Amino acid sequence: MTQFASPVLHSLLDTDAYKLHMQQAVFHHYYDVQVAAEFRCRGDDLLGIYADAIREQVDAMQHLRLLEDEFQWLSGLPFFKPDYLNWLREFRYNPAQVCVTNDNGKLNIRLTGPWREVIMWEVPLLAVISELVHHYRSPNAGVDQALDALESKLVDFTALTANLDMSRFHLMDFGTRRRFSREVQQAIVKRLQQESWFVGTSNYDLARRLALTPMGTQAHEWFQAHQQISPDLATSQRAALAAWLNEYPDQLGIALTDCITMDAFLRDFGIEFASRYQGLRHDSGDPVAWGEKAIAHYEKLGIDPLTKTLVFSDNLDLPKAVELYRHFASRVQLSFGIGTRLTCDIPQVKPLNIVIKLVECNGKPVAKLSDSPGKTICHDKAFVRALRKAFDLPQVRKAS
């Protein structure tokens, strides 16, 4: 299936902020590290028929580059260094790093190459896949339907929060990867800008063009890669946390907790890390139980939870965010990142549950053992066993 009218992507910055944040850290600390990543469809969608169209879009991405006004805008942000931005100015996507195949209807994608380059593919490639699939499946849906659905949700949201002090409710758009389309995401974000509780977007292109705050720190791959970068598996998570602080000592301090389960994370998250990081991000498992564990951990360390921020970003919608806000608002700072339920929430449109995750670093396996067993990713069962042993995980989690 080919002949999509034009390139889906128009800007190198049409990606999530944490990709550039991680890329700069990799550029400075792990320039020669090699990785492999793979696509997963967590649903039952057979997406292989779109392989040719996806390959065309991958080839078109080699023409994206950082434009001068984009370079100047990034230069004005406090955490990017000139050496990295000058390198990014010369960066081009290399389609040879991407293998796209149709395996009897199943879409297979494997990415290989230097981590500093491969790191950039995940978010825009997922956005491309999502937009292509929805273009063919739902040709009559688009911005109008998405905005109508959002307005309905906002009416319900207003009623749901009528008796609440919403002054500490902060919502972010995390919807780039699985958006219906670029145009839908932009329309949704522009509408949300009218709400006082909307604080920013993870999409750097939208943040620049709409004068919004870009949001994001690091992703699972940062912790996964350290499983092979670090000489000792048992200390690899601490090594990842320390390396991040080395790159960003006073900024971008929200740590992701579920690469090797929340319990294993908290064992590594001692007083120095807990003091220096501004907060934690939830991305799998029961959000209330997770938040209670986080607050209890801070209190045990003698840290006032009200000085820290919990970011919830796992399969959220507005009612779930309000429920969590009601539960936690008096005890800790809160932010909520909503993705698919904002940028691909259209009647009769089935969002894709798709990811691209790291599977190897320097030719050796890495794993994600999240707080939701269905999100576990690793090919190598022996490595999963070693990881469980190193982090004293009590429960067998099936590798997939």
Curated annotation (Swiss-Prot):
Pathway(s) it belongs to: Cofactor biosynthesis; NAD(+) biosynthesis; nicotinate D-ribonucleotide from nicotinate: step 1/1
E.C. number(s) listed in UniProt: 6.3.4.21
One Pfam family this sequence matches: NAPRTase_N
Effect the entry attributes to changing residue 220 to E/N: Loss of ATP hydrolysis and autophosphorylation
Enzyme class: ligase
Catalysed reactions, as listed in the record: nicotinate + 5-phospho-alpha-D-ribose 1-diphosphate + ATP + H2O = nicotinate beta-D-ribonucleotide + ADP + phosphate + diphosphate
Keyword Cell inner membrane: no
Modified how: Transiently phosphorylated on a His residue during the reaction cycle. Phosphorylation strongly increases the affinity for substrates and increases the rate of nicotinate D-ribonucleotide production. Dephosphorylation regenerates the low-affinity form of the enzyme, leading to product release.
Gene Ontology MF, one: nicotinate phosphoribosyltransferase activity
GO cellular component annotations of the record: cytosol
Cited InterPro entries: N/Namide_PRibTrfase, NAPRTase_N, Nic_PRibTrfase, Nic_PRibTrfase-Fam, Nicotinate_pribotase-like_C
CDD domains: PncB_like
Keywords tagged on the record: Ligase, Luminescence, Phosphoprotein, Photoprotein, Pyridine nucleotide biosynthesis
Modified residues (Phosphohistidine): 220
Top-rank taxon, per record: Bacteria
Keyword check for Ligase: yes
Gene Ontology process terms (BP): bioluminescence; NAD biosynthetic process via the salvage pathway
Gene3D superfamilies in the record: nicotinate phosphoribosyltransferase
Family membership noted in the UniProt record: Belongs to the NAPRTase family.
Classification via HAMAP family: NAPRTase
Function: Catalyzes the synthesis of beta-nicotinate D-ribonucleotide from nicotinate and 5-phospho-D-ribose 1-phosphate at the expense of ATP.
Name this protein carries in UniProt: Nicotinate phosphoribosyltransferase
Source organism: Salmonella typhimurium (strain LT2 / SGSC1412 / ATCC 700720)
Taxon lineage: Bacteria, Pseudomonadati, Pseudomonadota, Gammaproteobacteria, Enterobacterales
Originating gene: pncB
